[in-house]
Amino acid sequence: MMLLRAGSLAAHPAARWWILFGLWLVYGSFGLVVVSIAPLVAPIQQELSMSHTAIGSIMGAWQLVYIGAAIPCGMLLDRIGGRLALLLGVALVALSVLGRALAVDYFTFLLAVMVFGLGGPIISSGAPKMVAELFSGSQRGLAMGVYMTGPALGGVIALALTNSWLMPLLDMQWRWVMGVWAVCALLAGVIWMVIAWLYVPAATPVATNAARPSQLATMLELVRMPAVQVLLVMSTGVFLFNHGLNNWLVELLRHGGMSATTAGYWATLPTLVGIVASLVLPRLATPERRFLILGALCIAALLACVLLRFQDPVPLTAGLLVQGLARATLMTVLILTLVELPGIGEARAGVASGMFFSAAEIGGVLGPLGIGVMFDLSGGFDSSLNALAVVASLLALGCVVLKRLANAPQR
C-alpha cells in the first residue's frame, strides 16, 4: 500500500474509498454512543434516581458542550488535518461512554456525557471536510450519504441489541453494556489510525499566514452571508427534531404500551429507512433539485410528528418511516448546501462545518431537554409532538427563503 502525499488524495480513487470506510467506522461509533442512553433510560433512572427532566438534561448535555467546542474544533481540524483530529475525536467518544459505565450519580453521569461534546464536533466537522476534499459532483453527495449510514447503523445496533441481547447476556447490568460500546469505539479508533497512517497525509497544505485571513475573520465573513444565517437557523430546528425524537423514541413507544425489547426493535425502523435514504437522496440532491428535496423532507418531518401519536400499527409504522426519511437526510442535504454555497468552498469547509454544528446543537440541547420537561409537566408526549410539528413547519418555510437567497446573484 502506498502512503499518499499531501495534495494527492483526490488523485487515488481506491485510497479515497478506504478513507471513506475509516470515516464510516468513526462516525458509526459516534452514532452508537449517541443512541446508547435511549434504550437504557428505565434502568438508569431507577438506579440513579432520575426524573424525565433529569435524564433529558443528560441527553442534551453533550450538545451544550458541543455548542462551545464546535468552532474551535473546526479550527483545530483545519490546522492539524483530519488524520490526527479524527483520532482524537474517537478517543474522546470512547472515554465518554466508559465514564458513563463508571458513573455513580447524576453529576458523574452528566460529566461523562459532556466529554462526548468535545469529541463529537471533531468527528462531525471532520467527516464532511474530508469528503469535500476527496469527492466532487454527484459522487460527493453519494460519499456523504455513505458515511452518514455509519451513525445510522450504529444507532440500529444500540437500539436492537441492548435490551434483546446485551442486557440479558450481561445479567441486566446497563454499565456493562456501556463498557461494550466503549470497546467498539476504541476498535473504530484503531482501524482509523491504520487507514489514516497509510493513506491520509499528515497535514493538508495551506497558504502562508500572510496570504490567508484569520479564522475569526473567516467566521465573521461567513456569518454575514444571508444564506448562511438562514441555514444556521434551520440547522437548529433540524437538530431539535432529530435529537429530541432520537433520544426519546424508545420511551415514547414504551409509553404507548410496548415492552422495552419491542420498543427497541420498532425504534430501529426509522434508522433502517434512513440508511437507504442516506445512500439515495444526497446523490439526487444536485443543485437543481436540492431545495425541492429539502422541502419534501421538512414535510416528512411534519407528518412524522402527526403520525407518531397513534398506537395503531398502520399510522405508527407510517410515522416511523417518514421520521427515518427526514432525520437521516435533512442534516446531510443541509451540509451539502452549506459547503457548496458561493464563498464557502473546500478551504472554508472546516470552519463552516464547525459553525453549522455549533448552531445546530442549540437545537440538540433543547430537543431532549424540552421533551423531558414537557413529559414531567403533562404526563405524556403529545405536547412535545405538537411542538416538533411547529418546528417542522417553520423548516419548510425556511427552505423557501434559503432557495431564494442561495440562487440570488452574487455581488
Predicted feature residues:
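C-terminal transmembrane helical hairpin of 12-TM major facilitator-type secondary transporters
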Residues: 289-337
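Residue-level signature of mid-helix packing/kink "hotspots" within the transmembrane helices
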Residues: 35, 63-71, 156, 271-279, ...
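Cytoplasmic helix-loop-helix junction between adjacent transmembrane helices
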Residues: 112-150
